[in-house]
Every structure is written in C-alpha cells, then in structure tokens.
Amino acid sequence: MSQEIRQNEKISYRIEGPFFIIHLMNPDNLNALEGEDYIYLGELLELADRNRDVYFTIIQSSGRFFSSGADFKGIAKAQGDDTNKYPSETSKWVSNFVARNVYVTDAFIKHSKVLICCLNGPAIGLSAALVALCDIVYSINDKVYLLYPFANLGLITEGGTTVSLPLKFGTNTTYECLMFNKPFKYDIMCENGFISKNFNMPSSNAEAFNAKVLEELREKVKGLYLPSCLGMKKLLKSNHIDAFNKANSVEVNESLKYWVDGEPLKRFRQLGSKQRKHRL
C-alpha cells in the first residue's frame, strides 16, 4: 500500500527512526480542528500503522494550547450546507458528524503503535478525547488541563470518553467534571497517573518542550527490542478494546439525536456571537 498521503496546512508529520511525529501547527487559532483535520489525523495514524519501521507515534502541538477542539467555522460550514444536498437532517449529520467521529476515534482505539502525547497546553472537546486515548502523556508544566464541555454545548460524550475517562480518572471524578463542565486539571491527572512526566517548562516554549521529549525518548529506546513494545501494547489494549469499540458506536448514535434536534448548533452560534460564555 502506498506510503504517500495528502498534505494539510494545519498538521505536519515526519518520521525519525522509530518515531512517527505528528505536529499540530495552527497556534494562532489555538490549534482548533475542522472535520477534515480530524479525518487527516486518522489517516496519519493509519500511515504510521502501515510503516514497519515505526514503533511510536508522537503527537505534538504548538503555541499555548494543544488544541481548542472543534473549529467554529467547520460547524458553521456544516450548518450552511445546502439543505437540498441531504434528504433529511439525520442524513446531514450522519455525513457531517457520525462518520467523522467514528473514523478518527476508531483510528486511535485500534492504533498498533505506542501513542505518545506531548501536552503543551489545554485540550478541549474531541481533541481532549483523543488525548485520553493516548498510551503515554507528557506535560509541559502544571498549567495543562483537559475540558469536555459536552453539557455546555448540548452534546454528550464522544471520542470514547464514556470508557477512557472513568478508566483513567475514576467514575465519580468523571461524573463531577462532565456533569458540571469542570476541567480535569493537572492535579487530577497526576493523582491518577495520567501524566507520566511534567517537564516544568514555560508555556511559551512549546517547541523546546517537544524537542526535549524527543531527546529523552531517543535515549529511552536505546537497547530495547522494539517489537516487544508493540506486543505489550497489544496485550494491554486487549483488556478494554471491546468496551471502547462499543462506546464509539453507542456515543455517535446517541449524539446524532442531539445534532438533529439542533441544540448544539444553537449553542455554537451563541458562542460565536459571545452570548454564551466561551468554553475556553
């Protein structure tokens, strides 16, 4: 299968030895992602999966946010789609929401390489959900947090968070944060072993943070039999893979009802016009 892939102006990738490095590079827009950007992330994971020389997939970002989640422009674009293009609202949102979310979440769930996230700042929404699907997370400092503003946006859990958040943070903490739109702050992440290492670097120094993580990883893999790493990931993942696959299907089908009813669109419009407090 071809190892070539289309380009994306917001996301780059490169391969260095056993590392497949994905870089979010739209800091001026807080690395917000449109639907096609999330699909591109999934395509990159598939590309890394097919490369036999790759053992670790590293996701880095830039600026002060890892990713602020879905770009309002993408939501507006879907809202403005010609109604004649779709026979029903259900058909419209199956195309604009369900297919995309199932695809990118599945790409993260089934990824065979060790997934490493370099958390240079906050992550929001679906982007934060994908962070929670990573195997190892390093933080730039103690200012990082994850926020899942589903209740504030008229939505429900997505991106496997029905399973990943209780698994990694505990059931009651997950309820508290999701029900009341509270962030999973650094202390919560540390208490639950979610952050493997805090690099204690300034938030303005994302590029130096990314370079430092990569430098340490190069040292850590020296002398390892890397196929063993993939074998262990496969076994560890087998504990929860069925639950994640089920959650991915149930989440999008339940969420579809909310999109069809129109509440998320109304709330995104309010955010765009500043009528509702911004989720960031």
Curated annotation (Swiss-Prot):
Keywords assigned by UniProt, alphabetized: Fatty acid metabolism, Isomerase, Lipid metabolism, Peroxisome
What reaction does this catalyse?
Answer: a (3Z)-enoyl-CoA = a 4-saturated (2E)-enoyl-CoA; a (3E)-enoyl-CoA = a 4-saturated (2E)-enoyl-CoA
- So what EC number does this one have? 5.3.3.8
Residues forming the catalytic site: E158
Q: Name one GO cellular component term.
A: peroxisomal matrix
- From the Swiss-Prot or TrEMBL record, state where the protein is found: Peroxisome
Pathway, per record: Lipid metabolism; fatty acid beta-oxidation
The induction text for this entry reads: By oleate.
Identify the residues that bind substrate. S68, G69, A70, D71, F72, L126
Q: Motif span (Microbody targeting signal)?
A: 278-280
- Judging by the UniProt lineage, the source's domain of life is Eukaryota
Q: Name one GO molecular function term.
A: delta(3)-delta(2)-enoyl-CoA isomerase activity
Top-level EC class as recorded in UniProt:
isomerase
Endpoints of the signal sequence: none
GO annotation, biological process: fatty acid beta-oxidation
Say where the protein is mainly found: other
Q: How is the subunit organization of this protein annotated in UniProt? A: Homohexamer, dimer of trimers. Interacts with DCI1.
Q: Record's family? A: Belongs to the enoyl-CoA hydratase/isomerase family.
Q: Report the protein's function.
A: Essential for the beta oxidation of unsaturated fatty acids.
Stated name of the protein: 3,2-trans-enoyl-CoA isomerase
The organism is Saccharomyces cerevisiae (strain ATCC 204508 / S288c) (Baker's yeast)
Query: What gene name is given for the protein in this entry?
Result: ECI1
